UniProtKB/Swiss-Prot annotation:
GO molecular function, one term: identical protein binding
Gene label: aqpZ
Organism name: Escherichia coli (strain K12)
Result, substituting residue 20 to S: Loss of oligomerization; no alteration of water permeability
Name this protein carries in UniProt: Aquaporin Z
Motif (NPA 1): 63-65
Comment text on domains: Aquaporins contain two tandem repeats each containing three membrane-spanning domains and a pore-forming loop with the signature motif Asn-Pro-Ala (NPA).
Site (Selectivity filter): 43, 174, 183, 189
Residue stretches spanning the membrane: 9-29, 34-54, 82-102, 131-151, 156-176, 202-222
Length: 231
């Protein structure tokens, strides 16, 4: 079990460090900034690379909504859920702490003012989208993500391609929803940066736990009841 938890911790660290790091350090860099598309690709690449690296150890969840969604879909034991979630949150926080340390080396850096890649709705949405818009996009995309994960890892799916499908799905999810919520679909990712933003991000954090997890459960149940092929 320790190896599984370590894999989830390292995998989530990589996701937050790579994905949020691209948003904090590279997205707005003068003239050469990578923009929304670059950040979306970075998140997808973090999952793709770590799924290949440690997916064979832990399953490569790196996300509490994925762990709980896989449990809802009958693919993951309930007794391991809490341990996985804790490992994911710890890995994310360590990554965010290192990002904060790096970003603080630039004169004028202010995590509270910049948002530090935090997720938000209403006045804290990158595009000014309402709480209802945030609810719909996070719910639908979290459910869709779990559908992709269940399908790509199904025993009838082509072997060896799951990390590619899942990484591309996460890229697509970010391309759709960065303007709406800055894209969560992952409570561990949201928690990690919210701690260092320290203000409104913590006040809205509950939303980015509840909605992605509910969406993940919906996705898991849809695949289990309607799409999964029975022997």
């Amino acid at each position: 079990m320790f190896r599984k938890l370590a894999a989830e911790c390292f995998g989530t660290f990589w996701l937050v460090f790579g994905g949020c790091g691209s948003a904090v350090l590279a997205a707005g860099f003068p003239e050469l900034g990578i923009g929304f598309a670059g950040v979306a690709l970075a998140f997808g690449l973090t999952v793709l690379t770590m799924a290949f690296a440690v997916g064979h150890i832990s399953g490569g969840h790196f996300n509490p909504a994925v762990t709980i969604g896989l449990w809802a879909g009958g693919r993951f034991p309930a007794k391991e859920v809490v341990g996985y979630v804790i490992a994911q949150v710890v890995g994310g926080i360590v990554a965010a702490a290192l990002l904060y340390l790096i970003a603080s080396g630039k004169t004028g850096f202010d995590a509270a003012a910049s948002g530090f890649a935090s997720n938000g709705y209403g006045e804290h949405s990158p595009g000014g989208y309402s709480m209802l818009s945030a609810l719909v996009v996070e719910l639908v995309l979290s459910a869709g993500f779990l559908l992709v994960i269940h399908g790509a890892t199904d025993k009838f799916a082509p072997a060896g391609f799951a990390p590619i499908a899942i990484g591309l799905a996460l890229t697509l999810i970010h391309l759709i929803s960065i303007p709406v919520t800055n894209t969560s679909v992952n409570p561990a990712r949201s928690t990690a940066v919210a701690i260092f933003q320290g203000g409104w991000a913590l006040e809205q954090l509950w939303f980015f736990w509840v909605v992605p997890i509910v969406g993940g459960i919906i996705g898991g149940l849809i695949y289990r009841t309607l799409l999964e092929k029975r022997d």
